[in-house]
């Protein structure tokens, strides 16, 4: 099968690497290079880096809609299918209609739940216990096309955006390789999504990165997991930004009236204990403004915390 692959982040690179030896990948389309990290260096996407290493031609159009030059490039390559995984732009219908098998998308959710750009983050943020991948026939709507296959996995208590992305990328690649021969042979007919069950997963906003210490402790934990390993959940301590990347929640009831966000315990095994709505949030991995990530012991030793101090 002659395939043009559309993808950008690490999630997409893992899928590409896994399917590479099984398909004839004749071109790769990825987002234009963007500034990344503290130094804001212009860096290629993980998918582009893989393509360069393998000597595959890379295309990085700024826009797709109305781009006649790009349309003709895809047409001239005569692909059998476009495979898309976290590309980051909506692919116009005229491009999807070029190959006989159209566009086939690997989406990191159990469709029709969590359509959109951030299904992994949203599933974690909402404390879901299960997620999965869907292989979908693409159409002009955002993740609205009929579904070829779905595979589900549990979300474990210690899963974060990083670990779950890797699991779902591997799951998606395996499922894709399973269904592609069936699609080619006409043995697999995609099933339309139930619109009444649809939900959306827009990118997380900057406001959603800020910890509200008055929230349910389990919800704060889910927020931290959804934002780890980057960009991190944000709070303020001693007037500066502090990011939290790992925490555990312990349900506990308090007699005394302690303000949420207050440090109430320091335990060299459990972490930094912060009072939240219905218990204690044990902070385990943190990053003070302008410094590297550190574990709670390094933070405790470096900052000499006082019981009664508050995160705001």
Curated annotation (Swiss-Prot):
UniProt key word Transferase: yes
Gene3D superfamilies reported in the protein's UniProt record = 3.40.50.12230
According to UniProt, the reaction catalysed is: L-methionyl-tRNA(fMet) + (6R)-10-formyltetrahydrofolate = N-formyl-L-methionyl-tRNA(fMet) + (6S)-5,6,7,8-tetrahydrofolate + H(+)
For this protein, the Enzyme Commission number is 2.1.2.9
- The residues forming the signal peptide are none
Q: Which InterPro entries has this protein been placed in?
A: Fmt (IPR005794), Formyl_trans_C (IPR005793), Formyl_transf_N (IPR002376), Formyl_transf_N_sf (IPR036477), Formyl_transferase-like_C_sf (IPR011034), GART_AS (IPR001555), Met-tRNA-FMT_C (IPR044135), Met-tRNA-FMT_N (IPR041711)
Write one Gene Ontology MF term. methionyl-tRNA formyltransferase activity
Keyword annotations of the record: Protein biosynthesis, Transferase
The enzyme's first-digit EC class, named in words, is transferase
Asked if the Swiss-Prot or TrEMBL record annotates the protein with the keyword Protein biosynthesis, the reply is: yes
Residues recorded as binding (6S)-5,6,7,8-tetrahydrofolate, renumbered to this chain, are 109-112
Cross-referenced Pfam families: Formyl_trans_C, Formyl_trans_N
Q: Which family does it belong to?
A: Belongs to the Fmt family.
Q: Which PANTHER family match?
A: METHIONYL-TRNA FORMYLTRANSFERASE, METHIONYL-TRNA FORMYLTRANSFERASE, MITOCHONDRIAL
Q: Report the function annotation for this chain.
A: Attaches a formyl group to the free amino group of methionyl-tRNA(fMet). The formyl group appears to play a dual role in the initiator identity of N-formylmethionyl-tRNA by promoting its recognition by IF2 and preventing the misappropriation of this tRNA by the elongation apparatus.
Name of protein: Methionyl-tRNA formyltransferase
What is the protein's species of origin?
Dictyoglomus thermophilum (strain ATCC 35947 / DSM 3960 / H-6-12)
The beginning of the lineage is:
Bacteria, Pseudomonadati, Dictyoglomota, Dictyoglomia, Dictyoglomales
